[in-house]
Regions:
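Conserved alpha/beta core of the MobA/IspD/sugar-nucleotide pyrophosphorylase nucleotidyltransferase superfamily
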Residues: 2-17, 147-193
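Nucleotide and nucleotide-moiety/phosphate-recognizing core
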Residues: 9-129, 160-168
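Single, functionally critical "micro-switch" positions that shape active/binding sites
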Residues: 22, 35, 135, 175-176
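Active-site-adjacent beta-strand anchor residues
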Residues: 65-66, 92-93, 133, 146, ...
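Short, glycine-/small-residue-rich phosphate/pyrophosphate-handling segment
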Residues: 128-159
Protein backbone atom coordinates (compact mmCIF):
# COMPACT_ATOMS: atom_id res chain seq x y z
CA UNK A 1 0.00 0.00 0.00
CA UNK A 2 1.44 3.34 -1.05
CA UNK A 3 0.96 6.14 1.42
CA UNK A 4 1.50 9.34 -0.55
CA UNK A 5 1.94 12.21 1.85
CA UNK A 6 2.47 15.43 -0.05
CA UNK A 7 2.41 19.02 1.03
CA UNK A 8 0.07 21.56 -0.50
CA UNK A 9 2.68 24.22 -1.24
CA UNK A 10 1.11 26.45 -3.91
CA UNK A 11 4.09 27.13 -6.21
CA UNK A 12 4.35 24.40 -8.88
CA UNK A 13 7.79 25.58 -10.03
CA UNK A 14 9.49 24.13 -6.95
CA UNK A 15 11.04 20.66 -6.93
CA UNK A 16 9.43 17.97 -4.80
CA UNK A 17 11.41 16.41 -1.97
CA UNK A 18 11.23 12.61 -2.24
CA UNK A 19 11.72 11.11 1.22
CA UNK A 20 12.77 7.49 0.73
CA UNK A 21 11.71 5.28 3.63
CA UNK A 22 11.37 1.83 2.14
CA UNK A 23 14.75 0.23 2.89
CA UNK A 24 15.10 -2.76 5.17
CA UNK A 25 17.68 -1.28 7.55
CA UNK A 26 19.71 -4.50 7.74
CA UNK A 27 23.00 -2.84 8.79
CA UNK A 28 21.24 -1.14 11.70
CA UNK A 29 19.83 -4.46 12.88
CA UNK A 30 23.23 -6.12 12.45
CA UNK A 31 24.79 -3.42 14.67
CA UNK A 32 22.38 -4.30 17.49
CA UNK A 33 19.39 -2.10 16.67
CA UNK A 34 16.15 -3.54 18.05
CA UNK A 35 13.78 -1.51 15.88
CA UNK A 36 13.93 -0.38 12.26
CA UNK A 37 16.43 2.48 11.98
CA UNK A 38 13.76 4.95 10.88
CA UNK A 39 11.76 4.17 14.04
CA UNK A 40 14.77 4.48 16.35
CA UNK A 41 14.53 7.35 18.81
CA UNK A 42 16.78 10.34 18.31
CA UNK A 43 16.07 12.59 21.26
CA UNK A 44 12.31 12.65 21.70
CA UNK A 45 11.35 11.76 18.10
CA UNK A 46 12.07 8.98 15.64
CA UNK A 47 14.75 9.36 13.00
CA UNK A 48 12.10 9.55 10.26
CA UNK A 49 10.05 12.12 12.19
CA UNK A 50 13.09 14.42 12.43
CA UNK A 51 13.63 14.09 8.67
CA UNK A 52 9.97 14.75 7.85
CA UNK A 53 9.78 17.71 10.25
CA UNK A 54 12.77 19.33 8.53
CA UNK A 55 11.29 18.71 5.09
CA UNK A 56 7.91 20.14 6.14
CA UNK A 57 9.62 23.20 7.63
CA UNK A 58 11.24 23.90 4.25
CA UNK A 59 7.88 24.65 2.66
CA UNK A 60 8.83 22.58 -0.39
CA UNK A 61 6.38 20.04 -1.81
CA UNK A 62 7.21 16.53 -0.62
CA UNK A 63 6.33 12.88 -1.01
CA UNK A 64 7.02 9.98 1.35
CA UNK A 65 7.90 6.72 -0.45
CA UNK A 66 7.50 4.05 2.20
CA UNK A 67 6.41 0.99 0.25
CA UNK A 68 8.98 -1.80 0.21
CA UNK A 69 10.99 -1.95 -3.03
CA UNK A 70 13.82 -4.30 -4.09
CA UNK A 71 16.37 -1.46 -4.27
CA UNK A 72 16.90 2.27 -4.00
CA UNK A 73 16.59 2.68 -7.78
CA UNK A 74 13.13 1.10 -7.64
CA UNK A 75 12.14 3.41 -4.76
CA UNK A 76 13.28 6.52 -6.63
CA UNK A 77 11.44 5.45 -9.80
CA UNK A 78 8.23 4.79 -7.83
CA UNK A 79 8.44 8.16 -6.08
CA UNK A 80 9.05 10.02 -9.35
CA UNK A 81 6.13 8.13 -10.92
CA UNK A 82 3.91 9.23 -8.00
CA UNK A 83 4.97 12.87 -8.49
CA UNK A 84 5.31 12.85 -12.28
CA UNK A 85 4.18 16.46 -12.70
CA UNK A 86 6.82 17.85 -10.34
CA UNK A 87 9.24 20.48 -11.58
CA UNK A 88 12.19 18.44 -10.32
CA UNK A 89 13.08 16.25 -7.38
CA UNK A 90 15.30 16.30 -4.31
CA UNK A 91 16.06 12.69 -3.38
CA UNK A 92 16.43 12.44 0.40
CA UNK A 93 16.82 9.12 2.23
CA UNK A 94 14.65 9.08 5.36
CA UNK A 95 17.64 8.31 7.57
CA UNK A 96 19.12 11.84 7.34
CA UNK A 97 17.44 13.40 10.40
CA UNK A 98 19.77 16.40 10.71
CA UNK A 99 19.27 17.86 7.23
CA UNK A 100 18.81 21.63 7.38
CA UNK A 101 15.91 23.34 5.62
CA UNK A 102 18.43 25.86 4.28
CA UNK A 103 20.22 23.04 2.45
CA UNK A 104 16.97 21.89 0.85
CA UNK A 105 16.42 25.45 -0.39
CA UNK A 106 20.01 25.74 -1.67
CA UNK A 107 19.78 22.52 -3.69
CA UNK A 108 16.34 23.53 -5.03
CA UNK A 109 17.69 26.91 -6.10
CA UNK A 110 20.74 25.37 -7.80
CA UNK A 111 18.41 23.18 -9.88
CA UNK A 112 17.27 26.34 -11.67
CA UNK A 113 20.62 26.30 -13.52
CA UNK A 114 21.89 22.70 -13.38
CA UNK A 115 20.24 19.35 -14.24
CA UNK A 116 21.77 17.45 -11.29
CA UNK A 117 23.01 18.96 -8.02
CA UNK A 118 24.89 17.09 -5.29
CA UNK A 119 25.55 18.76 -1.93
CA UNK A 120 29.13 18.42 -0.69
CA UNK A 121 30.23 18.79 2.92
CA UNK A 122 33.87 19.58 3.68
CA UNK A 123 35.49 17.59 6.52
CA UNK A 124 39.07 17.35 7.76
CA UNK A 125 39.34 14.12 5.77
CA UNK A 126 38.11 15.73 2.56
CA UNK A 127 34.94 16.45 0.65
CA UNK A 128 31.95 14.15 1.16
CA UNK A 129 29.03 13.95 -1.26
CA UNK A 130 25.69 13.81 0.49
CA UNK A 131 21.94 14.19 0.09
CA UNK A 132 19.54 15.42 -1.04
CA UNK A 133 20.61 14.97 -4.64
CA UNK A 134 18.62 17.32 -6.84
CA UNK A 135 17.32 16.40 -10.30
CA UNK A 136 15.72 18.82 -12.75
CA UNK A 137 12.56 17.87 -14.64
CA UNK A 138 14.67 16.95 -17.68
CA UNK A 139 15.94 13.90 -15.76
CA UNK A 140 12.42 12.46 -15.38
CA UNK A 141 12.63 9.62 -17.92
CA UNK A 142 16.06 8.53 -16.68
CA UNK A 143 14.78 8.51 -13.08
CA UNK A 144 11.71 6.48 -14.06
CA UNK A 145 13.99 3.85 -15.62
CA UNK A 146 15.98 3.24 -12.41
CA UNK A 147 16.07 -0.25 -10.88
CA UNK A 148 18.11 -2.15 -8.34
CA UNK A 149 20.51 -1.07 -5.63
CA UNK A 150 22.70 1.48 -7.39
CA UNK A 151 20.25 4.30 -6.78
CA UNK A 152 20.51 7.21 -9.19
CA UNK A 153 24.17 6.64 -10.15
CA UNK A 154 23.25 6.02 -13.83
CA UNK A 155 21.47 9.39 -13.98
CA UNK A 156 24.50 11.17 -12.52
CA UNK A 157 26.70 9.51 -15.14
CA UNK A 158 24.36 10.56 -17.95
CA UNK A 159 23.75 14.17 -16.92
CA UNK A 160 26.84 14.90 -14.85
CA UNK A 161 26.54 16.45 -11.41
CA UNK A 162 27.20 19.94 -10.17
CA UNK A 163 28.66 19.86 -6.68
CA UNK A 164 27.22 22.41 -4.27
CA UNK A 165 29.32 23.09 -1.19
CA UNK A 166 27.11 23.31 1.88
CA UNK A 167 27.75 23.93 5.55
CA UNK A 168 25.48 21.13 6.71
CA UNK A 169 26.83 17.98 8.35
CA UNK A 170 23.24 16.69 8.09
CA UNK A 171 23.81 15.97 4.39
CA UNK A 172 26.25 13.19 5.32
CA UNK A 173 24.86 12.08 8.70
CA UNK A 174 22.85 9.02 7.77
CA UNK A 175 21.79 6.42 10.30
CA UNK A 176 23.02 2.98 9.28
CA UNK A 177 24.29 1.66 12.66
CA UNK A 178 23.78 2.25 16.37
CA UNK A 179 27.09 4.14 16.33
CA UNK A 180 25.68 6.47 13.65
CA UNK A 181 22.64 7.06 15.87
CA UNK A 182 24.90 7.94 18.81
CA UNK A 183 26.89 10.36 16.64
CA UNK A 184 23.68 11.99 15.36
CA UNK A 185 22.44 12.30 18.94
CA UNK A 186 25.62 14.17 19.92
CA UNK A 187 25.33 16.46 16.88
CA UNK A 188 21.66 17.15 17.64
CA UNK A 189 22.49 17.98 21.27
CA UNK A 190 25.17 20.38 20.03
CA UNK A 191 22.66 22.16 17.79
CA UNK A 192 20.16 22.50 20.62
CA UNK A 193 22.73 23.84 23.10
Amino acid sequence: MLRAMSSTYPLPSLPTVLVLASGRGERFAASGGRVHKLQALLGDKTVLQHTLDNVRASGLPWHLEDVGHPGMGDSIAAAVRATANADGWLVLPGDLPLILTETLHQVAQALQQHPVVVPVFQTQEGRLRGHPVGFARGCREALLALKGNQGAAPVLRTFGATELIVNDVGTVTDIDTLQDLERASALLAGRQA
